[in-house]
């Protein structure tokens, strides 16, 4: 899920990095879209009621302020940061030292498929709020979440069991899926 020191070859490897843009999500989004860099990114968002000048309206806002994911090599991001230094790598403090937080491509693909629908029944969780031990590994076949891999678990506060995609140490997202679209995954490797 993460690496501490990169070799020259690893610096060129494209992966999903967890990044922070403190109070600059919109600027980060605009700069990452820029044709010069054109880095792939994802900011988990949801609709929330906000009041501006006494008027309530539903706005699409980041789920976790300042959190974004960038799909690029370490070298590409470092080059981007030379010009726009507001983007920071999210790090874990481990016994071996600080490590960059990265997410495997297949986990991120499943996460994006659920999170990008912006539906009201899509729910986000902190990792410690979800107990995946009682869940069953599943893959969704058909529907709008086709090929999403996650855990089918009962989530507190929800009537039906839901498919949960966990990004270890970062966040989780869940969606309600009809059980007829699910099949059990045979191997834990499918979830990595």
State the predicted function of each range:
Residues 163:
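N-terminal beta-strand motif that seeds the catalytic metal site of vicinal oxygen chelate
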Residues 143-144:
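Short, surface-exposed secondary-structure boundary micro-motifs
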Residues 148-155:
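Short beta-strand-centered aromatic/proline hotspots
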Residues 183-192:
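Single conserved hydrophobic/aromatic residue that forms the stacking wall/gate
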Residues 155-156, 189:
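A short, basic/aromatic helix-end/turn motif that makes direct DNA contacts
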Residues 135, 147:
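Short coil/loop residues immediately preceding or within conserved phosphate-binding loops
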Residues 2-134, 159, 167-181:
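Acidic-enriched and Gly/Ser
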């Amino acid at each position: 899920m993460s690496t501490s020191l990169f070799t020259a070859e690893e610096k060129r490897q494209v992966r999903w990095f967890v990044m922070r843009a403190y109070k600059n999500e919109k600027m980060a989004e605009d700069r990452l879209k820029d044709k010069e860099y054109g880095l792939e990114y994802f900011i988990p968002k949801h609709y929330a009621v906000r009041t501006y000048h006494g008027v309530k309206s539903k706005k699409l806002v980041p789920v976790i302020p300042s959190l974004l994911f960038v799909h690029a090599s370490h070298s590409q991001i470092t080059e981007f940061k030379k010009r726009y230094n507001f983007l920071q790598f999210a790090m874990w403090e481990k016994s071996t030292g600080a490590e960059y937080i990265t997410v495997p491509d297949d986990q991120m693909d499943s996460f994006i498929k659920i999170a990008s629908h912006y539906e009201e029944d899509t729910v986000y969780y902190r990792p410690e709020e979800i107990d995946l031990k009682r869940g069953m590994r599943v893959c969704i076949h058909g529907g709008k979440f086709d090929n999403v891999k996650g855990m089918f678990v009962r989530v507190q506060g929800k009537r039906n069991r839901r498919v949960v995609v966990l990004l270890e140490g970062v966040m989780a997202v869940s969606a309600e899926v009809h059980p007829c679209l699910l099949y059990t995954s045979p191997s834990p490797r499918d979830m990595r």
